[in-house]
Amino acid sequence: MMKKIDVKILDPRVGKEFPLPTYATSGSAGLDLRACLDDAVELAPGDTTLVPTGLAIHIADPSLAAMMLPRSGLGHKHGIVLGNLVGLIDSDYQGQLMISVWNRGQDNFTIQPGERIAQMIFVPVVQAEFNLVEDFDATDRGEGGFGHSGRQ
């Protein structure tokens, strides 16, 4: 299923020097987001930075949200992940998409202008209304927390 999402180009290089986000294959879940930088940015181990994408989106449908996720190769090979682990884009947000990048690796890492540094997926959202109760109906698990269901 393809859903139309409004996108605004904030930097004129996007769509020319830096390709618009696209799905790499027909089965891809995520769109690659690129670093819309003037110059390369070097991240030392432990450093974080906010990287602009040059794009703004307006989802406009409260039953959808976008999530920004790390690219698996950058995380596994270089220790480059998102500083907030997952970026959540609400349906009514209209500002620039910014990517919080964290170097959790052991070596310096350089982000090049136009480099693919994150991916964005669209996910369904259910807004819940809380129903206040005194007690819950009993379940097998009950209040068992972390590790309660075992390892095997």
UniProtKB/Swiss-Prot annotation:
Q: Keyword Lipid metabolism, does the record have it? A: no
User: Which reactions is this enzyme annotated as catalysing?
Assistant: dUTP + H2O = dUMP + diphosphate + H(+)
The superkingdom listed in its UniProt entry is Bacteria
Describe which pathway this protein belongs to, using the record's wording: Pyrimidine metabolism; dUMP biosynthesis; dUMP from dCTP (dUTP route): step 2/2
Q: What class of enzyme is it?
A: hydrolase
What are the protein's UniProt keywords?
Answer: Hydrolase, Magnesium, Metal-binding, Nucleotide metabolism
Q: Does the keyword Hydrolase apply?
A: yes
* Pfam families found in the cross-reference section: dUTPase
Which GO terms label this protein's molecular function in UniProt?
A: dUTP diphosphatase activity; magnesium ion binding
Q: Which residues bind substrate?
A: R71, S72, G73, N84, L88, I89, D90, M98
**EC number of the protein:** 3.6.1.23
The family database entries (InterPro entries) matched by this protein are listed as: dUTPase, dUTPase-like, dUTPase-like_sf, dUTPase_trimeric
Obligatory cofactor(s): Mg(2+)
Residue spans crossing the bilayer: none
**One GO biological process term:** dUTP catabolic process
Chain's role: This enzyme is involved in nucleotide metabolism: it produces dUMP, the immediate precursor of thymidine nucleotides and it decreases the intracellular concentration of dUTP so that uracil cannot be incorporated into DNA.
Which family is this sequence assigned to?
A: Belongs to the dUTPase family.
Subunit description: Homotrimer.
**Name of the featured protein:** Deoxyuridine 5'-triphosphate nucleotidohydrolase
Ranked from the top, the taxonomy reads: Bacteria, Pseudomonadati, Pseudomonadota, Gammaproteobacteria, Enterobacterales
